Amino acid sequence: MNFSNGSKSSTFTIAPSGSCIALPPQRGVATSKYAVHASCLQEYLDKEAWKDDTLIIDLRPVSEFSKSRIKGSVNLSLPATLIKRPAFSVARIISNLHDVDDKRDFQNWQEFSSILVCVPAWIANYVTNAEVIGEKFRKESYSGDFGILDLDYSKVSGKYPSVIDNSPVKSKLGALPSARPRLSYSAAQTAPISLSSEGSDYFSRPPPTPNVAGLSLNNFFCPLPENKDNKSSPFGSATVQTPCLHSVPDAFTNPDVATLYQKFLRLQSLEHQRLVSCSDRNSQWSTVDSLSNTSYKKNRYTDIVPYNCTRVHLKRTSPSELDYINASFIKTETSNYIACQGSISRSISDFWHMVWDNVENIGTIVMLGSLFEAGREMCTAYWPSNGIGDKQVYGDYCVKQISEENVDNSRFILRKFEIQNANFPSVKKVHHYQYPNWSDCNSPENVKSMVEFLKYVNNSHGSGNTIVHCSAGVGRTGTFIVLDTILRFPESKLSGFNPSVADSSDVVFQLVDHIRKQRMKMVQTFTQFKYVYDLIDSLQKSQVHFPVLT
């Protein structure tokens, strides 16, 4: 069977994506040079020792896979955001494979002569995910053949019923800790109150009863790091289960949390209404500029991209230059910002291009988080690596580090850079503020330190847009922008502040919705959303007068 070879001599090219992966699939025609005829399945299944020779990966949700599957296939149901992360290696892919027979050892995956992937639907989103998986195998020296079945599962099962196994999975998937995915917390799992909970204490839940029929994986964005010593649970020998809510911070016992959680769900619903039309070029919420064959490769995460209407356009010196960067202009009633993703290696020169275009004499960059978290790269270092006095050239831009100092007992770092454009004689200065102790999808642990950081950035006297980034440029970035804006509000705007007021009168709700209309998923998690209310409440209880920032 002739199809794409994954040896070092072959070249993998990630196909352009269609709609944003976070959305419901948009029907469109996808193509892939790695497509192989599904008719080859019977040929492989007829081989006497095919299980030792061929790996068939099914990308559908576990709940669907458990009902019906290609004979001998294994399931891989993970969010695109996780699959695309550079640090998510083949070893981690292999550790997340779910096998019905639970007998095969996939650790020697290099010995498979062929790897076939079956996608849930033959559209660009899923095909691109499959190609990313193939790219990871190739980079780790896989020398066999890699192919994507040219028919999605529903068409395979209809056209080639002889290769389908319809026997239900009674206890193979989901019932045992070893078969569960790495633990992650979604909003639903950590909801403050379960109104449908039975029993006298809804803050303590027993281990869930396995129910394969209703089992599905959450599209989580923050998986806990893999624990090499105990494959079944990142917490050691304890059974992986939904956590008892007694272990959740005391803030979750606040009666207002249920109200806030419902508000957050309404924000999510409003955003979903916008995102369903993002693949339509004529829509106000179109994101198609970010998913062309050239711009797509400059996105750190495939499901977090800018809207066409607010994206930053790099100033081009020739028509052939690409003007794309994963960044959005954000305007609030008090300030102007640029929210962008953490740089990847191929976009560093674009980042400095954006800085040059959008600051005047002194610019301000705010970096939230560290370069690496739990072994995963969150942002590529985009400044000189050898410290003070070192210079580094990124495309047309020469960046020199002037100074570096730890501030507020090393809670954050201030760096100062000089930038020079090869096409202009002038030099611009940039103040770079890094708040490293703020992890992905979470909120800062110290309210006082966060307020001091905001004040310090406010005193930078930079000109032009304040450039803010974390890793994806939405969660921590959006939270910072909301906090920076609210702390500039006058006292009258926050008078009688109460989370229980209607959404139309809630300044936090309205502000988050406002910036989400300019960049998707801003203030990404419920934890971050609640933190904004907590910070305002803390300041008011301390009788701090607004505006805190001027």
Swiss-Prot record:
Which GO BP terms apply? cell division; negative regulation of p38MAPK cascade; regulation of p38MAPK cascade; signal transduction
Q: Where is the Tyrosine-protein phosphatase domain?
A: 260-539
Q: In the UniProt record, what gene is named as encoding this protein?
A: pyp1
List, alphabetically, the SMART domains matched: PTPc, PTPc_motif
Under catalytic activity, the entry for this protein gives: O-phospho-L-tyrosyl-[protein] + H2O = L-tyrosyl-[protein] + phosphate
List the GO cellular component terms: cytoplasm; cytosol; nucleus; protein aggregate center
**Protein's cellular compartments:** Cytoplasm
Family matches, as InterPro entries:
Prot-tyrosine_phosphatase-like, Protein-Tyr_Phosphatase, PTP_cat, Rhodanese-like_dom, Rhodanese-like_dom_sf, Tyr_Pase_AS, Tyr_Pase_cat, Tyr_Pase_dom
Q: Main EC class of this protein?
A: hydrolase
Source organism superkingdom: Eukaryota
Q: Kindly provide the name given to this protein in its UniProt entry.
A: Tyrosine-protein phosphatase 1
> Active site at which residues?
470
Protein keywords: Cell cycle, Cell division, Cytoplasm, Hydrolase, Mitosis, Phosphoprotein, Protein phosphatase
Q: Which residues carry this modification: Phosphoserine?
A: 318, 320
Q: What is its EC number?
A: 3.1.3.48
| Isomerase as UniProt keyword | no
Q: What is its main location?
A: cytoplasm
**Which family, according to UniProt?**
Belongs to the protein-tyrosine phosphatase family. Non-receptor class subfamily.
Its function? Plays a role in inhibiting the onset of mitosis. Dephosphorylates sty1/spc1 and wis1/spc2/sty2.
Enumerate the transmembrane spans: none
Question: Tell me, what is one Gene Ontology molecular-function annotation carried by this entry?
Answer: protein tyrosine phosphatase activity
